[in-house]
Amino acid sequence: MSGSSEQELKMMVRSLNLESGFLGTFDCRFPGFISKDRRQTAIVNTGPREQGGVHWIALAWDPTSRKMFLFDPLGWTNAELKKYYGFSYQNMVQRSALSSADRCVTLERNTQAVQCTCAGSCGLFCILFLYCAHLSPSNPFGTSLFQSLDGQKSGMVPRSPEALHKNQQILYNFLSSKCAYFRKNARNIVMNTRLHLIKTH
């Protein structure tokens, strides 16, 4: 196995006390956020569950700012997600907007990669993002934890893999210090998400 399983991600969410508002892990058929009056988060795979999944992204809804935050560890645009994975987040955003009173949702997303394409750590980075959304529901990308990551232009072959590799260490250090489930299962989790797991550079 490579990457993170749904069960592992759910256990880390529980270990970090991020269950409040967490809707769960979903495949590409995630319906979007329906209840607009409460804070919600979700981890979504770009592939169908029956095929084992492909790539994890994370979503957060803040009712105060009326913003939906979308985090993709690889920083892909909607067009790139469609090209590489056959996945589009546009429908999720539209479904969320249709369920709101004014049918209007502001989408804020990261535009740079923080994960190297050689690693299987997308699920773990999603956990870090949910933690940032817990710290600052209206500005998760502005937290000091998220800002400690070095953003790079997205691409199958990273321009500066060394910087992205440092992000992976920041990620592991964060989980090691905050997440008891990670500490208990670190050997297997790191083995399945490690750098150079996939040959991209």
From Swiss-Prot:
It catalyses: Cleaves proteins of the adenovirus and its host cell at two consensus sites: -Yaa-Xaa-Gly-Gly-|-Xaa- and -Yaa-Xaa-Gly-Xaa-|-Gly- (in which Yaa is Met, Ile or Leu, and Xaa is any amino acid). One of its GO terms (molecular function) is cysteine-type endopeptidase activity. One of its GO terms (cellular component) is host cell nucleus. Its EC number is 3.4.22.39. It is found in: Virion; Host nucleus. Gene3D superfamilies: Adenoviral Proteinase, Chain A. Induction: Expressed in the late phase of the viral replicative cycle. Belongs to the peptidase C5 family. Interacts with protease cofactor pVI-C; this interaction is necessary for protease activation. This is Protease. It comes from Snake adenovirus serotype 1.
